[in-house]
Amino acid sequence: MEENKGDWNDEFVHHWKYYRGHARASPSDLEFIKKKVLEKIEKYNGDKSKVKFLVLGSTPEYRNLCGELGITCYCFDFKKYNFDYLAEEVKNKPKEIFTQGNWLESIPAELANEKFDIILGDCIPNIIMPEDFQKLFENVFKLLKQDGFFMPRTYIKEKNEKLTSEEAIKKYREEGSKKPVYTWVGRELYVSSYKEGKDRIIVNRTDRY
């Protein structure tokens, strides 16, 4: 029997239009980011061409925000396919510059000499392994201006919030209906597997930063 192996990236981009919060940026998330971008525009005395904005991935909400504000959007993604496919979700299309590569490897030559005011990464901490955090932050540090912002939106566990995997699956059966489990109840599954007081990530600061 031939094994059919899918690409998890395809699942995300193909179902993006069906996601809801927390799986995609909410209006309040975007309002917060917009405020930070406007601060940078003010810093440059209204010259939007000086604002450098990088998305790790191809998140359409962030690209749309750039179009709304009239600034160039750099996207750095594993696959050009993701960038092209999600372009259909971008209503206010900005000027875009795409670079293909891996955030956890050496920074591609196209970006090596760039410095950004704002770097966004939608749920990046949820899709990389704990041992890769150090490399991610090192690369982000190299790409950020000294007063730049890195905002990796992620799932948050509320204080004292508890869920079981059974509750997560029940929610999926009641609401998900044939949608991929992870894309529908991913956050709930993360919370259900969290070990109170044990699961945490510590990233060492080093001279390399």
What are these regions (language model features)?
Residues 61, 204-209:
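Rossmann-like AdoMet/SAM-dependent catalytic core
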Residues 50-107:
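Class I SAM-dependent methyltransferase SAM/SAH-binding core
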Residues 117-134:
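A short SAM/SAH-binding and catalytic strip from SAM-dependent methyltransferases
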Residues 1-48:
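Class I SAM-dependent methyltransferase Rossmann-like catalytic core
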Residues 104-119:
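A short acidic, Gly/Pro-enriched loop at the edge of an enzyme's catalytic core
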